[in-house]
Structure formats: structure tokens, C-alpha cells
């Protein structure tokens, strides 16, 4: 069982006390199927969702705001589905510990190929000319979008300290956005330096799901609009169209962490 890195949590709590992006909930929607969400991506009003669990993992597609799930493709029972991203007409789906990635037709949900993958699979997103992946550590890997071959390792830091538990990923406004496993925080990351540039406390949506230890935030996808995202979590009843609101003056993390 993966545990949350307490150092990362304490560090982010300290910084969030002074510099925070607030979430404004614009719309609450049903979460079709209430799956064990591991990955999420949206394009032109269509949502693709990866759900996990051995013998329960699947890839499904539905329209944004739909109450009922749409087409669904089950994974083999020995695979645990993780993050997904869309590259033109295809989808990449990672698996947790099985060291393979799946390539799907985005429209038909036909499985096209299975390839070796060199790490645990957590999150994946399409970026400028590449894809980026996470494995629950403080590292992101830049990869070839056609083959997933690794090109570069990016070490994520906040004021020189490692930020671990990087989970589902999304690309928006020149930043990599990640939710942190088991926590209520999102971080925005500079893809060139690996430095955390944005911190978001998602308590506005988390507080509606407290009480279930497995119902953690997991699933972030960019939506049209400035700073707008779709958020959900494992077994959540709802999905949330949110907007980031930067309503506090920024200070340097170094000064904050030094007290």
C-alpha cells in the first residue's frame, strides 16, 4: 500500500498558508459509473476515463455532463489501469505494476497494441511534442509520444525540496498539473526546470467526500477556459468543473519555509 510522504505534505501545508490558488466550483456533474478513477482526459466535450482494480480495470468514454456511462472496454484481469492521455486518434493507458502500456483507438475503444514500459505507471499527459509520465515519486519522465521511449527525467522541486506522490497529470497553459496521491492538493510544474510554480488546495471539492479513506482526489483534465479543469476522485459520485482563482499575493517559497 502506497503511503503519503509526510515531508511533502508538511512543506506544502506551510506554503499554502501564505500563497494559494483557490478553486471556484462552476458546475457539479454526475460521475458516470462512479469508477475507481485512475486517469482522465477531455477533448471537444468527450471524456475518457481509466479505472483501476485487478479484474475491474476499464477504459470508458462518455459525454461531459452525462449521467450514465458510455462505451466501455475491460482490461485483462491481470492489469491494473492507470493514467491515460490522447494523442490525436489514439489513447495511451498506463498500468500500475505490470510494466506495460496499452494503445487504444479513441473512438472505437479497440485495443491496438501493448508495449513494454520501464517504470510503474501512474499519470500521463500529452505536452508540447512529447508525453510526460509520473510514477508516484518526485520524478516526471519526458517520452516519445509514438513509442513512450524515455527521453529525459525531470526532478520536481519546491524551493529545492523534492515533491513526491505525483499522480494523475494534465498539461495546460505551459504547465504540468498533478494531483498529489492521498492529498487534497494540485501542483503546477514548470516542465523545463521541474520547479513547482502553482499550489492549489482542492478542499472545495474534497470536503464533500471525507469519510471514505479510498475516495481520494484522482483525476484532473483541462477544459476550455482560463484556468478551468475537470476534477474527480476514486468512487466519487460527482465530477467538478472548477476554475483556479489566484487571490493571494505571491511570496517566495524560500522565505515561507524559513518561517
Cite the ranges covered by each PLM segment.
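A short helix->beta-strand "capping" segment at the edge of beta-propeller domains
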Residues: 13-33, 64-68
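A short beta-strand motif characteristic of beta-propeller blades
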Residues: 24-30, 68-74, 110-115, 152-161, ...
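Beta-strand-rich domains and repeat architectures in extracellular enzymes and scaffolds
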Residues: 26-58, 72-85, 122, 233-240
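Beta-rich, blade/repeat-based domains predominating
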Residues: 33-44, 77-87, 117-131, 160-174, ...
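Conserved beta-strand positions in repeat-built beta-propeller and related beta-rich domains
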Residues: 48-55, 91-98, 131-137, 178-182, ...
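Short loop/turn segments that connect beta-strands within beta-propeller blades
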Residues: 63-67, 105-109, 145-148, 190-194, ...
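Blade-loop segments of beta-propeller domains
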Residues: 67-103, 109-123
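Hydrophobic, well-structured mid-protein blocks that either form specific transmembrane helices
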Residues: 101-159
Amino acid at each position: 500500500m502506497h503511503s503519503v510522504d509526510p515531508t511533502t505534505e508538511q512543506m506544502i501545508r506551510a506554503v499554502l498558508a501564505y500563497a494559494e490558488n483557490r478553486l471556484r466550483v462552476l458546475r457539479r456533474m454526475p460521475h458516470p459509473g462512479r469508477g475507481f478513477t485512475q486517469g482522465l482526459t477531455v477533448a471537444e466535450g468527450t471524456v475518457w476515463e481509466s479505472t483501476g482494480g485487478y479484474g475491474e480495470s476499464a477504459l470508458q468514454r462518455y459525454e461531459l455532463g452525462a449521467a450514465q456511462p458510455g462505451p466501455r472496454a475491460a482490461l485483462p484481469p491481470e492489469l491494473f489501469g492507470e493514467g491515460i492521455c490522447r494523442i490525436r486518434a489514439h489513447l495511451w493507458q498506463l498500468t500500475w505494476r505490470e510494466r506495460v502500456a496499452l494503445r487504444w483507438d479513441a473512438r472505437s475503444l479497440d485495443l491496438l497494441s501493448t508495449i513494454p514500459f520501464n517504470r510503474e505507471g501512474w499519470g500521463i499527459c500529452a505536452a508540447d511534442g512529447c508525453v510526460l509520465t509520473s510514477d508516484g515519486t518526485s520524478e516526471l519522465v519526458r517520452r516519445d509520444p509514438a513509442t513512450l521511449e524515455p527521453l529525459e527525467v525531470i526532478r520536481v522541486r519546491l524551493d529545492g525540496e523534492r515533491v513526491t506522490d505525483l499522480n494523475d497529470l494534465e498539461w495546460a497553459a505551459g504547465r504540468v498539473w498533478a494531483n498529489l496521491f492521498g492529498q487534497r492538493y494540485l501542483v503546477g510544474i514548470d516542465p523545463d526546470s521541474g520547479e513547482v510554480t502553482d499550489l492549489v488546495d482542492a478542499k472545495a471539492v474534497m470536503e464533500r467526500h471525507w469519510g471514505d479513506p479510498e475516495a481520494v482526489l484522482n483525476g484532473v483534465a483541462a477544459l476550455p477556459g482560463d484556468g478551468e479543469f475537470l476534477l474527480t476522485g476514486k468512487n466519487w459520485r460527482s465530477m467538478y468543473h472548477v476554475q483556479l482563482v489566484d487571490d493571494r499575493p505571491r511570496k517566495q517559497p524560500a522565505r515561507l519555509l524559513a518561517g
